[in-house]
Amino acid sequence: MANNKSAIELKNIVVDFGESVAIDNINLSVEKHQLVSLLGPSGCGKTTTLAVIAGLIKPTSGQVLFNGYDVTKKPPQERKLGLVFQNYALYPHMNVFENIVFPLYSDNSWKQAVLEKNSVANHEINCLLLTSNGASVQEIDQLNKLFHDSIEKPKQIQYQINDLNVSVFKNLNELTANLKLIPSKHQFAITNLNKQTLKQINELEAEFKTKWKLQKQTPIKSGVEHNAKLQAIKQHFSYEKQRLKKHYFKTKVELKQTLVENLKLVKKAISEQTKLIKQSSDYTKLKQLKRLIKVEPNQLKKQYKVFLNQLIKNYSLKTDKLTDTQLNEIEQIKTRIVSIKQFINKTALEVANKLAITKILTKRPDKISGGQQQRVAIARAIVRRPKLLLMDEPLSNLDAKLRVQTRQWIRQFQQELQITTVFVTHDQEEAMSISDVIVCMSTGKVQQIGTPSELYLKPANEFVARFLGTPEMNIIECSVKNNQLFWNNHLLVTESFKLNVEKLLVGFRYEQLVVTTNKSSLQAKLINIENLGKHLVATISLFDTTLSMRLELNSHLKVGDSLNFIIKANNLHFFDIDTKQRIEI
């Protein structure tokens, strides 16, 4: 069943802007109720990935699934999600309450859900009244079926339409996306050609000036010979410059021809694909369903109303035969019937109470603190009760202390509401403390997916190893001889390891380096000390390499001192020297 699927699934997502690939074939699943962090440096593609999930950016290729349903083509407002950005974007002319409720007034699907709840309550009351006035079990069952069909059948038809839209137009959509990319890729190629040609001309001019200057400075033995050499230099420069220009214009023409040919090929492929689609049985079924969705909801509602009116005519909706218990039950059901405005106020107050901002509801955004603004932004994002909450570096505008407090609060709040959350950050400490799962990214690719402890204790490659942990992991190149590790022909650790390579990268955390009095151990020079309050972080230099190590606060070492140290071998990490991937032993 679809509701057993992952909350979010990205399949082979590519975002190609022509001049650069922002996301390179990402596959990712986010399970229900998890808080998943997209972690990586600037430019790694994490915010673009979030934008694809939100529907703010259309992928060049690939699928976005929510609970098993394809939403790749759906706009953000139809994805039932909440968004919190780096800039909270609160409306300055509205107070906190008005900011929170604003999305509700502009969300037709949310209003429709409220009206549907009212319809359910009214239907339950009608069933109770009709039963008390003599309607049979079979008649009530038929009424329930007609009501259920009027609500659920249009939804099922829409789900079928969505699924068919994806399967029928998948190849065509990819071709159309490629067609849109061709001009930008052509422009990128022209830009590169311009840069390359300009660089070559500048280099040629620099070479010409150097040769001209040298010839000018050369002692003159013969004026004729001297002038001839100058003329030769000038002619060579003119010839080379002309050659570059010819090459430039020729390449430009070739690129233009390639553009025209590519456009022609893709347009032809689109035309052929369109013909195939129109001949397919799925396309015929899709057209039938689209016609059906226009009339079926009204027909189903009409059938329900006709049967309901017939039952009312036969049995009435009088309350004189109801017991006190039944009357109380009806009154209880009536409390669920509210106007749009009443429901908006009730929902907003519930959210404000959960986020502890009820005392500031009448204040404007400029009259509250940064932390409060952030909570208001979250309240506005979740007031529609979205299935997903997307947060793009929401803590970056807060000071260090408030950032720690707020991330703890977000985690607690997310666990209480059990809302599936995707959290973008470049701060590895933030991601480690708040996440169920971390997706570590670099250059548009997923480097590793796992729990915070999995990424920290077993990094999949050198990038993850360096990125997670403060200070970053020490990584050095070592050779392997007789199952022992050597760094610049010095024994690294006394322990042996079964490694089937001659060279590899060895990683170790700063706390694994320990000062020793053993003079035969590795010796380094202390070049920097940072006092972090609870301990010291020292930077040492050895074999033209800097390493980080931990020192206790009572250490008497100072910058410039030499020290001997050993490396604890119990948590060494090994990476392939070429692929940079983790080596398990």
From Swiss-Prot:
Keywords carried by this UniProt record: ATP-binding, Nucleotide-binding, Transport
User: Its GO CC terms?
Assistant: ATP-binding cassette (ABC) transporter complex, substrate-binding subunit-containing
**Xref: InterPro entries:** AAA+_ATPase, ABC_transporter-like_ATP-bd, ABC_transporter-like_CS, ABC_transpr_MalK/UgpC-like, Mo/tungstate-bd_C_term_dom, NA-bd_OB-fold, P-loop_NTPase
Residues annotated to bind ATP: 40-47
Q: Is Glycoprotein among this UniProt entry's keywords?
A: no
- On whether ATP-binding is a keyword of this UniProt record, the answer is yes
ABC transporter domain spans which residues? 8-468
Question: Pfam families annotated for this entry?
Answer: ABC_tran
Q: What's the protein called, per UniProt?
A: Putative ABC transporter ATP-binding protein MG187
UniProt lineage: Bacteria, Bacillati, Mycoplasmatota, Mycoplasmoidales, Mycoplasmoidaceae
